[in-house]
A protein has these predicted regions:
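Short alpha-helical segment that forms part of, or immediately flanks, the ligand-binding pocket
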Residues: 70, 93-97, 108-112
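Aromatic "clamp/platform" in nucleotide-sugar-dependent glycosyltransferases that forms part
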Residues: 84
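A short hydrophobic beta-strand element within the catalytic core of glycosyltransferases
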Residues: 79-80, 103
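Short hydrophobic beta-strand element within catalytic cores of glycosyltransferases
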Residues: 101-104, 111-114, 120-121
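A charged, aromatic-enriched C-terminal amphipathic alpha-helix characteristic of glycosyltransferases
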Residues: 138, 152-185
Length: 187
């Protein structure tokens, strides 16, 4: 994904896409609506998803081509990823790859990717079985506290955590590629 653009660590981004129910979007929108003093949240989701008019939420309902989406991901510095469940964690890894300060759910596999050195973990308050896995529902109060924690950080603190995430992402990607090549050579 890369992180060549200048990051704005005062802007929040949430990529709900077509599965906003699983991405914690309703909780995010509810909190943003309660806090008009918070910076603008850029929220990409389908038009039919959860929607509340708030002066500090900018909705993007239109289809975004890859180049435009990458521009948002690479320039907006704080990514909200309070997923109820993740398969592999592509959503979170994309945020890490762009050197974003990432907030996600403190449950597996999300907390296997984001650690306190690489982002902020939001506690969950409820779980529910889903097929062979578990959905973890973030605690709205804890998410609010974590957002306030980010807002209280200096630009440098935000950037350092995001750089740690990017560094881990690059190391992990290199490790994966090496292991894959070794595995394929051994076949």
């Amino acid at each position: 994904m890369g992180s060549t653009s200048r990051k704005n660590y005062n802007q929040f981004f949430h990529l709900a896409g077509s599965s906003s129910i699983q991405k914690g979007t309703k909780t995010i929108v509810t909190l943003w609506n309660r806090h008009p003093e918070w910076p603008t949240l850029i929220l990409r989701q389908n038009k039919k998803s959860f929607h509340v008019s708030a002066p500090n939420i900018q909705y993007i309902h239109d289809f975004l081509d890859d180049e435009t989406l990458k521009k948002y991901q690479n320039t907006l510095g704080i990514h909200l990823c309070p997923s109820e469940a993740e398969g592999f964690g592509h959503y979170i890894l994309e945020a890490m790859s762009t050197k974003a300060l990432t907030l996600t759910t403190n449950a597996p596999p999300m907390n296997e990717l984001i650690t306190p050195e690489r982002g902020l973990l939001v506690n969950y308050h409820n779980t529910k079985p889903q097929r062979l896995g578990t959905n973890y529902y973030v605690d709205p109060q804890n998410l609010e506290e974590k957002i306030e924690e980010v807002l209280a950080m200096s630009h440098q603190q935000r950037k350092e955590i995001a750089e740690n995430a990017r560094h881990w992402y690059l190391e992990n990607e290199q490790f994966f590629r090496q292991k894959l090549v070794t595995f394929l050579q051994d076949l």
